[in-house]
């Protein structure tokens, strides 16, 4: 697990010579538009990969492929097993560079499939599982030992990160694929729990984590609440002790009693 962008994962773990490229990266692609929202300034995962390389220039020349997707392959927003592979793309940041093959593939859009076509959850999971196998098979065909993945299909596409992570875990643990090293690049943000959910699911890889993320999160929240309650109780005790000390009757200096009473 990496709390980092896909580009950073490539720069940290890829090779600096194209002829020695041993890594592939999955671009969380738009199925119908080259680079997703890159030209509009959107910085999703695919757009960020475009910003750090010449990837968009290559994708922009494949408009016939994207047009074919729009006309014939929307498939109730599940899309189909179609991908582009851009070999040995150079990624640059701050005078550091590395190369990776880019697998341009779109996850099913669960949000639209549910809303517009009432696709069942089982059908959505089957489609995503099949798409994951499709991507891993492409990586095998490329012969790459390293693969950068992430929270593919989550957030705007409508899949829960824990579900996606478990599907990836199961396929990678199956032994059906040849990739030797997988980097899940999932930047942590305050807007979602993708990183925490992936980290939880993959904590015991290749074994399945028997506890759900919700159970672990609930236990952690209860522990935090107990700590806060204990701290508040201790603060109340300290304040009460201070009030007692401040307002308690004081004895005259030297222990002497007053010489007169009125």
Predicted regions and their residues:
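Macrodomain-like recognition of ADP-ribose-binding/processing modules
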Residues: 1-262
